[in-house]
Amino acid sequence: MDLPGNDFDSNDFDAVDLWGADGAEGWTADPIIGVGSAATPDTGPDLDNAHGQAETDTEQEIALFTVTNPPRTVSVSTLMDGRIDHVELSARVAWMSESQLASEILVIADLARQKAQSAQYAFILDRMSQQVDADEHRVALLRKTVGETWGLPSPEEAAAAEAEVFATRYSDDCPAPDDESDPW
């Protein structure tokens, strides 16, 4: 009787074998760098220093878009695609209820997302405008297309949304932050 075997028992996967004969990892897959040998990054004393500099350069290239509420209790930073990178809270949020804090974080995060996506809109529009030689009619069509096709807010729309939220959500009688004791 001929029983079906396990597909992994054959040598069909030798081309994607990431481990050497001794079982040690032979290759690494880095989403930024790609696939490379695991032995190459740490060979030589100068490469450690160069690797650290490359990480620093990469970190500096990441654009963050931050929105802080007027009372300066919540600050949200997002990446260009609108994903939240981090949220900073002032010590004064201890006086807020959980639902108030959650609501505040969501409102500020949405404004930060719009701000970041408006930068994405401006970047795409700038690159595409270069392709049409800055012809005003074509740029106007591009502006409409970028906004409608990708659903990205323009910088003007993002600024208007922030101004509207700040005007309606926060009154002028909100207490001014104490700059000496405030960590922000």
Swiss-Prot record:
Endpoints of the signal sequence: none
Chief place where the protein resides: secreted
Keyword presence, Secreted: yes
Subcellular compartments: Secreted
Effect noted on mutating residue 19 to R: Absence of EspD secretion
Null mutant phenotype: EspD deficiency results in decreased cellular levels of EspA and EspC, but does not affect their transcription.
GO cellular component: extracellular region; peptidoglycan-based cell wall; plasma membrane
Keywords in alphabetical order: Secreted, Virulence
Swiss-Prot/TrEMBL induction comment: Transcriptionally activated by EspR. Repressed by the MprB/MprA two-component system, by direct regulation and via EspR. Up-regulated by the PhoP/PhoR two-component system, via EspR.
Effect of residue 31 to A: Decreased EspD secretion and small reduction in cellular EspA levels
Region (Disordered): 33-56
Subunit relationships: Interacts with EccE1.
Protein name: ESX-1 secretion-associated protein EspD
Gene responsible for this protein: espD
